C-alpha cells in the first residue's frame, strides 16, 4: 500500500484517537501491511504509533495474532494474547543470550507495560470494589 493511501484513508481515524484520547493500551491486528504482520511491523508500532503520534502505553496482540515473539518485541509489541503460558519465553531468553535481541529492547517493553499498571493504580477509584474483593 502506498504511503498516501495508508495515511489519508486508513490511519487518519487512528491518529486522531491516539493523539486526542491518549489510550493506555492498543491492540494490533492479525493482517499484514506490505508483507509484514502488524505484530512485527516496526514502522507502524514504533515509528508511527510511538514516535509520530506520541503513544506511551503498551501494545498487545489480537488473540492468537503472534507469529514471531522476538520480532514483535523488536517492533514494539509488548504483550502476547492470550498468554502463551511461557511457550515463547525461552525464545526471548535465547534471543537475548545469542545477541539477536538487545536486552534494552526487552527492558523498554517491560517498562512500557509496567507504566500502564502504575497509571492504573494512580488513577483508579479507591472506592471501587472488585468482585473478587467482595467474596
Where are these regions (language model features)?
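Glycoside hydrolase catalytic-domain context in secreted enzymes
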Residues: 1-135
Amino acid at each position: 500500500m502506498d504511503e498516501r493511501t495508508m495515511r489519508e484513508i486508513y490511519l487518519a481515524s487512528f491518529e486522531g484517537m491516539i493523539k486526542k484520547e491518549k489510550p493506555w493500551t492498543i491492540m494490533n491486528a492479525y493482517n499484514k501491511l506490505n508483507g509484514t504482520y502488524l505484530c512485527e511491523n516496526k514502522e507502524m508500532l514504533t515509528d508511527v504509533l510511538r514516535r509520530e503520534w506520541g503513544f506511551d502505553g503498551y501494545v498487545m496482540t489480537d488473540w492468537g495474532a503472534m507469529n514471531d515473539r522476538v520480532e514483535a518485541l523488536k517492533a514494539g509489541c509488548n504483550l502476547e494474547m492470550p498468554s502463551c503460558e511461557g511457550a515463547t519465553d525461552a525464545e526471548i531468553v535465547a534471543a537475548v543470550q545469542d545477541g539477536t535481541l538487545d536486552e534494552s529492547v526487552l527492558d523498554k517493553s517491560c517498562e512500557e507495560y509496567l507504566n500502564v499498571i502504575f497509571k492504573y493504580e494512580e488513577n483508579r477509584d479507591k472506592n471501587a470494589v472488585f468482585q473478587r474483593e467482595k467474596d
